[in-house]
Amino acid sequence: STTLLASKSHIANVTGTDISFTATGSEYKITSTTTSLAGFAVRDLITVTGTSNNNSTFTVKTVSSANELIVEEIVTTETAGSSFTLDHTGFVSDKAKGDGYYSQPDGVHTVSYQVNSTMTGSIKMQGSLATTPTEDDYFDITGTTFTADQSTLISTANFTGNFVWVRAKATSVTAGTISSVLINS
């Protein structure tokens, strides 16, 4: 099996009046002067609230410094001043080669999710048919969603498709840890 995700925990919200948004060409930044953004990591999903123009969910593309994130999605330039909150609501795993990458005819995959007893949120698989996918190329794979209920700690799903790439996506995460996501293709 391939490990898509080893261990990932929910992190606390970040709130600040010095957080701003900048769009320069095709680079989209969330920055601050003193509020630390260092807790966020590449592929984290952060939901922004309190802004005039950027209340949305963004995928971290690069952590440039403790005070600067580059995100995948388009931001609207907005200066600091009001209190903005960045809520860590999930993340996506690194991509793994699916059966379509190897031109396998059966397309059968099995995924295993393991979480701790305080985990809240959902995990699902996404696939892409693109050879070099962007965020927009991924789609949810039917029948792979696991919603944590604090009692089921391991869940599995089988799915079929000749996906070139597959990855896991965790959403609505408010607490707890995903211990691992494993896949067999």
Where are these regions (language model features)?
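Beta-strand signatures of extracellular beta-sandwich domains
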Residues: 47, 122-126
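Conserved Ser/Thr-centered positions that define the repeating blades of beta-propeller domains
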Residues: 126-132
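Aromatic/hydrophobic beta-strand junction motif of beta-rich domains
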Residues: 32-34, 111-115, 168
